[in-house]
């Protein structure tokens, strides 16, 4: 994509009321703009990142046999009244009425809808186990939205729901989703720490939160340092991970902690996912059942959430420097930034145009503007593409281009042929 034809409204200065790094860089790099308190528009560059994260999530979910659906944003209030949760959400849930004066809600989550869906469509126990997921916008009227897309009122979420015939099968589904989440986060360049958590208004009696370590995090985590190696091991052992000590601040007790204090790490963390075993909380109140051997039984359920739009902010929090964002390759809006330092030089112009054509517009953001070299380099660092391809003085004098890695700042000099052979296929 040619920068001259693209829309990236960058900011030179940080707005006065913005302090968190992810909020600063998501505004300055033109990913988002605020429309109202806690509500943001996603601009072209930010939407590309959002879609790339969504694609990683969908690939891992689909690979594990989990089926995608799409459920409505607007839900009948009667379903929430039936489940008993209508009053639990209080002012966080946006309540509306349609033209016929029927009470509706703008869904903050979808347990009621999916339970209703299964109780009216499940025809046989042979359809179990079943896990359905969606990627859908949600709205929760946060009292104090802050930190930009890290804690906003409207957000994109991947939520999944499992249905099983008994407890053992439900725990198998829970463990499968646990593993899928680790695989998703690792592909995004993150190391997730799973901690046992309170189920809150979602319900159930087993729950884990997934956090990434970040100094800006709101949570305080205590964990056995061995868990990092377990998470990053190619052979993910869920039982070992679940049995390794981790705890949020409210559940940690140094006096009763089962492992030596010397092996405990304390860090700040950002929550990026949450999984729950719900048991029959919803199936019992909403009569979601199946029949086997002429016996009617309640469905065992689980639910699993990842804040997709929140992940954009979380990734920036752990992947940036003083100059801007450092996107992991898997989700970067473009793999390459192509900069022609001598745009008036015919040779540099021709080489840049040739590289742009061969790389393809989906892989490269080509700075074809007439801006100064300093502005181009500063913008390149701010936007954070993994690789910076620089056409300049070395190109003219030696026929070589400079390829600089954004994360390490290390540069390589090579011919255009070497570059295309080494990088285009990767």
Curated annotation (Swiss-Prot):
One of its GO terms (biological process) is prolyl-tRNA aminoacylation. One of its GO terms (molecular function) is proline-tRNA ligase activity. Keywords: Aminoacyl-tRNA synthetase, ATP-binding, Cytoplasm, Ligase, Nucleotide-binding, Protein biosynthesis. Its EC number is 6.1.1.15. Catalyzes the attachment of proline to tRNA(Pro) in a two-step reaction: proline is first activated by ATP to form Pro-AMP and then transferred to the acceptor end of tRNA(Pro). Coiled coil: none annotated. It is an enzyme of class 6 (ligase). GO terms for cellular component: cytosol. The lineage of its organism: Bacteria, Pseudomonadati, Pseudomonadota, Alphaproteobacteria, Rickettsiales. The keyword Transferase does not apply. It holds the Pfam family HGTP_anticodon. This is Proline--tRNA ligase. The keyword Repressor does not apply. Homodimer. It comes from Ehrlichia ruminantium (strain Welgevonden). It comes from the Bacteria. It catalyses: tRNA(Pro) + L-proline + ATP = L-prolyl-tRNA(Pro) + AMP + diphosphate. It is found in: Cytoplasm. Belongs to the class-II aminoacyl-tRNA synthetase family. ProS type 2 subfamily.
């Amino acid at each position: 994509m040619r920068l001259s034809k693209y829309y990236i409204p960058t900011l030179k200065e940080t707005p006065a009321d913005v302090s968190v790094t992810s909020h600063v860089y998501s505004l300055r790099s033109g990913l988002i703009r605020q429309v109202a308190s806690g509500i943001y528009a996603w601009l072209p560059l930010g939407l590309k990142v959002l879609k790339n994260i969504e694609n990683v999530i969908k690939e891992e979910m689909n690979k594990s046999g989990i089926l995608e659906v799409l459920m409505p944003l607007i839900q009948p209030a009667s379903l929430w009244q039936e489940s008993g949760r209508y009053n639990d959400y209080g002012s966080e849930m946006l309540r509306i009425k349609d033209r016929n004066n029927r009470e509706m809600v703008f869904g903050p989550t979808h347990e009621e809808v999916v339970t209703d869906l299964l109780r009216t469509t499940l025809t046989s126990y042979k359809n179990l186990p079943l896990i359905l997921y969606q990627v859908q916008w949600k709205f929760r009227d946060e009292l104090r939205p802050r930190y930009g897309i890290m804690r906003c009122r409207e957000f994109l979420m991947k939520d999944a729901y499992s249905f099983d015939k008994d407890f053992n099968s439900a725990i198998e589904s829970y463990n499968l989703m646990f593993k899928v989440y680790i695989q998703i986060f690792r592909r995004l360049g993150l190391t997730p720490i799973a901690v046992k958590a309170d189920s809150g208004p979602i319900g159930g009696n087993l729950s884990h939160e997934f956090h990434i370590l970040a100094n800006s995090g709101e949570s305080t985590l205590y964990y056995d340092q061995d868990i990092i190696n377990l998470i990053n091991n190619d052979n993910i052992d869920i039982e070992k991970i679940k049995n390794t000590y981790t705890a949020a601040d409210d559940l940690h007790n140094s006096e009763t902690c089962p492992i030596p204090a010397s092996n405990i790490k304390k860090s700040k963390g950002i929550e990026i996912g949450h999984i729950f075993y719900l048991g029959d909380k919803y199936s019992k109140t909403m009569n979601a059942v199946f029949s086997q051997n002429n016996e009617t039984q309640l469905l065992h359920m689980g639910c699993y959430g990842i804040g997709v739009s929140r992940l954009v902010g979380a990734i920036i929090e752990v992947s940036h420097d003083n100059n801007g964002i450092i996107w992991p390759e898997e989700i970067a809006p473009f793999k390459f930034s192509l900069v022609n330092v001598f745009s008036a030089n015919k040779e540099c112009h021709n080489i840049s145009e040739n590289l742009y054509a061969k790389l393809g517009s989906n892989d490269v953001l080509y700075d074809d503007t007439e801006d100064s070299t300093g502005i181009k380099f500063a913008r390149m660092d701010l936007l954070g593409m993994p690789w910076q391809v620089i056409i300049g003085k070395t190109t003219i004098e030696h026929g070589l281009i400079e390829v600089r890695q954004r994360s390490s700042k290390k540069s390589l000099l090579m011919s255009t042929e070497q570059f295309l052979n080494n990088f285009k296929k990767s």
